[in-house]
């Protein structure tokens, strides 16, 4: 409800199975239910989605521009849950060791994320590696990111000004045109 009531861009479903109820097939059921309202979904038309949104949230919200285009993303520690590829805009892969393997996920849907939360005082080489990574198939990757990116605000020997490393990685992946 928060996505529609607060006009957010979408939802990030965190999948970290620890033997709890929302693991495996239960998570898949939950995610596909969310996909009725947001994200790509081969099982529903935009008209059907709009009707569901109007029934749940009313005409005022349903009439907002782009209401049927909210994103649905999975945030996970592995490249599992490939059954959810058709229902996902992106897979935020918690590749905290600096890896770049997409597994069964298409490279263009994977956003590789490093752990700045624990490693902010280091050189963050893993983030640079993820920003530089280019898939062998020539397609674009989904991007790169970091857990606790706000810690890059801190100035220290590897970070001479706030967000210096993060801005450098943005330029590596998506260079400015001068």
Range-by-range predicted roles:
Residues 1-178:
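Secreted glycan hydrolases and related glycan-binding modules that recognize and/or cleave
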């Amino acid at each position: 409800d928060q996505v529609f009531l607060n006009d957010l861009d979408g939802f990030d479903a965190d999948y970290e199975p620890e033997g709890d109820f929302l693991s495996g097939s239960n998570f898949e059921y939950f995610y596909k239910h969310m996909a009725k309202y947001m994200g790509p979904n081969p099982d529903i038309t935009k008209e059907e989605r709009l009707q569901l949104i109007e029934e749940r949230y009313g005409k005022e919200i349903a009439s907002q521009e782009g209401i049927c285009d909210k994103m649905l993303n999975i945030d996970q520690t592995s490249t599992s849950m490939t059954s959810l590829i058709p229902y996902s805009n992106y897979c935020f892969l918690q590749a905290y060791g600096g890896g770049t393997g997409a597994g069964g996920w298409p490279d263009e849907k994977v956003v590789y994320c490093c752990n700045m939360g624990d490693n902010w005082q280091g050189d963050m080489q893993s983030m640079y590696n993820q920003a530089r990574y280019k898939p062998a198939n020539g397609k674009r990757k989904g991007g790169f990111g970091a857990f606790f990116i706000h810690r890059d605000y801190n100035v220290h020997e590897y970070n001479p000004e706030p967000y210096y490393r993060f801005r450098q990685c943005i330029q590596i992946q998506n260079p400015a045109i001068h």
